[in-house]
């Protein structure tokens, strides 16, 4: 009888996983670079790039930081995943997996701590908002962010309109010469749907009125309470978004690790 020849299939790198990871990270890389470019452009417009000390001069949060940090992280991850998959570089793929895993566990830890220490988080949020209320006129991006939050959640200040007493332009002291004295920003005002033109002076002198009278002109609920209410009302949607992000991260880690295993198996047969 003629001898039987056995054919062994040599291990190979899966093309589907490789190019899916490559394509996914190309998009991630481009988006990260776009975010980073927007952040740097915004800093350039505000003169921050020519005066780095301006970063620490602002008393509140500079929203541009969000673009720079998120864009930077996305760019680094996208670069590592994209080049790692294309060049079959196990170091970059492992870096991608570890970095993504670290972000995942930080998100998980933050979520657990936020649930366990709810009261502490609420106090820190109050403090954070009030620090930004103080710096309201210091930075146009911060001002726009606060106005957006107050309009979106129909709120005013961290706990209420009187938090605006912390701002030098809106406080009620006799030494305050500002026309905005004892007022609030226009974003606190109850908007009339019939009004076509925004009245930016609607909050002037409003805190001189009694609290019951104020309710007809401005939102009297604090943004911390309104944010908590919004979270409760949209809990399923918010949880779904975070679950989707978490699953995407886990999928990316598994895909990268699978690709690393394939590459090692191929190299072992050289």
Curated annotation (Swiss-Prot):
SUPFAM superfamilies documented for this protein: Tetraspanin (SSF48652)
One Pfam short name: Tetraspanin
GO biological process: establishment of protein localization to organelle; regulation of membrane protein ectodomain proteolysis
Disulfide bond annotation, renumbered to this chain: 155-223, 156-188, 172-182, 189-202
Gene Ontology cellular component list: plasma membrane
Spans traversing the lipid bilayer: 20-40, 64-84, 95-115, 235-255
Residues in the Cytoplasmic compartment per record: 1-19, 85-94, 256-270
Main location: membrane
Extracellular topological domain residue ranges: 41-63, 116-234
Subcellular localization, as worded in the UniProt entry: Cell membrane
Family in the record: Belongs to the tetraspanin (TM4SF) family.
Quaternary structure (record): Interacts with ADAM10; the interaction influences ADAM10 substrate specificity, endocytosis and turnover.
Role played: Part of TspanC8 subgroup, composed of 6 members that interact with the transmembrane metalloprotease ADAM10. This interaction is required for ADAM10 exit from the endoplasmic reticulum and for enzymatic maturation and trafficking to the cell surface as well as substrate specificity. Different TspanC8/ADAM10 complexes have distinct substrates. Seems to regulate VE-cadherin expression in endothelial cells probably through interaction with ADAM10, promoting leukocyte transmigration.
Name of the molecule in the record: Tetraspanin-17
Organism (species): Homo sapiens (Human)
Gene from which the chain derives: TSPAN17
């Amino acid at each position: 009888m003629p001898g039987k020849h056995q054919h062994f299939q040599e291990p190979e790198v899966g093309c589907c996983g490789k190019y899916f990871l490559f394509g996914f990270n190309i998009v991630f890389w481009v988006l990260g670079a776009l975010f980073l470019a927007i952040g740097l452009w915004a800093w350039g417009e505000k003169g921050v790039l020519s005066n780095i000390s301006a970063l620490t001069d602002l008393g509140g949060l500079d929203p541009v930081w969000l673009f720079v940090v998120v864009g930077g992280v996305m760019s680094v991850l996208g670069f590592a995943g994209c080049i790692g998959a294309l060049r079959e570089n196990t170091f970059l793929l492992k870096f991608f997996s570890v970095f993504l895993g670290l972000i995942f566990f930080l998100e998980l830890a933050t979520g657990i701590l936020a649930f366990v220490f709810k009261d502490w988080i609420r106090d820190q949020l109050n403090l954070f908002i009030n620090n930004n209320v103080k710096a309201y006129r210091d930075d146009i991006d911060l001002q726009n962010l606060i106005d957006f939050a107050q309009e979106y959640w129909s709120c005013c200040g961290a706990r209420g309109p009187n938090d605006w007493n912390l701002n030098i332009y809106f406080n009620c002291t006799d030494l305050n010469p500002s026309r905005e004295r004892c007022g609030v920003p226009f974003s606190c005002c109850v908007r009339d749907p019939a009004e076509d033109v925004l009245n930016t002076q609607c909050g002037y002198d409003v805190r001189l009125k009694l609290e019951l009278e104020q309710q007809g002109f401005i939102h009297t609920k604090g943004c911390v309470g309104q944010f908590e209410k919004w979270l409760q009302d949209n809990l399923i949607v918010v949880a779904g978004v975070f679950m989707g992000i978490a699953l995407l991260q886990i999928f990316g880690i598994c895909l990268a690790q699978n690709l690393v295993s394939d590459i090692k198996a191929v190299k072992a047969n050289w």
